[in-house]
Amino acid sequence: MSLVYQAGTLNTTALTVPNLYVQIAQPQTLGLTGASSSKLGIVGTAGWGPVGAPVPMGGMSDYLAAFGAKQNAVTDAGLAVNIAALQGASSFAVVRVTDGTDVAASGSLGEISVEAAHTGTAGNGIVVSVSATGAGYALSVSHAVLGFANYSGVDWMALAAAVAQDLSALITVHLPETVPDVVAGSVTLSGGLDGGVPSATDFVGQDEAIRTGMYALRGQGCAIALLHGVNDQTSYSLQAAFGLGEGTYMIAAGPAYDTVTNAVAVKAASGLDSPAVKLMFGDWLWWSDDVHGTMLVSPQAFAAGILSALSPEQSSLNKALSGIVGSQKSGLSGSSATYSTAELSTLFTAGIDVICNPAPGGAYWAVRCGHNSSSKATVNGDNYTRLTNYIASSLAGGMGAYVGQVVNDTLFSDIRATLLGFLSSLLSQGILGVQNGELPYSVVCDSSNNPQTRTALGYVQADVAVRYQGINEKFVVNLQGGTSVTVTSAGGSV
């Protein structure tokens, strides 16, 4: 009788019984899928939702369901989501932070205590009602923004169990030792508090078993992240370390109403000099909010939003931004005051970017430099940080399949094929580009960089070199005009 095996489970050099042996080989794929380059992590405040836990979402509708309405606060996470989404961002991970003095709203229905599932002022709008039905009782929970839910049961124990089984329930029901009969009634929860304004330390959080703040974004695959409204320079180095470790481009900002001289001095004193952090000048922007009207907000979400919407080889330089109606520099009435070349030069030389109007392309709001905070010209572009992180994350996410395989020429060939295939796809999609007819990448993985002395110890090495495309930052047009100018045409006549 013939036997069927999965390939690799049968030692075909030790067969003793004459028979038919069928080995099923799994389809081999040498492809490598790119990592996400658009996910934006936001750490901010909110009036509802879990604290210290990253919540994935696609836009404002998801945010409203998870964290409630936007608040009139510069640290509000919903404000950042709204601004970034308007620039084209569509993938978020939001972490709510508090100062620890937040309180959940509560109320009672007779002897039954009802408490909001999360802390915050949004819980004050939750209405809980109990009514009799033909089969028992109905417990109705509703909120104008957070939604509603209905539960049914024959008594309070059944109703409480139904609420407990709902992972998205807006309330928790606490029963006394002696559970009373159900009595129809209604209550609006009250007493919910957001607490005070969290400190920069609260926003950074703790990198422990239970992570909080910025560290809650660890492992979430965020290509870009920001601590919304935080301008404390003591957090810059921590953001840089996190960004380097996670492959995340951190967007920081200076305080509102900052000056060029102070911004340069503060950055120098903080020691920030890293391609992992983009530092925006503290010229905060006037934003036209659909709920709270005109608000003065940090430039972080604008820069992060446009970067999230762009392919990783792109720069934020000169890309039009939406929703801005003015800035501290220019005022609300239009671009009445603009930056001088000297001011821009001072900021850019110090590794500080700014959003202003006009931009090189015309009278619109845009990021003016497209640089990170590094002082090294070879690594200070948005495109360097984002494309390097993208390629590294893609390799980290797919090349691990080769660990544990036997080291031989076939393995070297498969590794090369996978890497070359991935880089070729970047070339075909315009993320990489041919210059002077030469491929912008090379891969070496053979005996030349894997001698037996190394492979015998379990090491395999692939050397990958990738040349990025430059960004046109200083466009020079040489014009010669006059009646005496001789013009040479390439051929033909008009």
Task: Identify the role of each PLM range.
Residues 1-415, 422-449, 455, 494:
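A glycine- and small-residue-enriched flexible loop/hinge signal that marks low-structured segments
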Residues 447-494:
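C-terminal edge-of-domain segments
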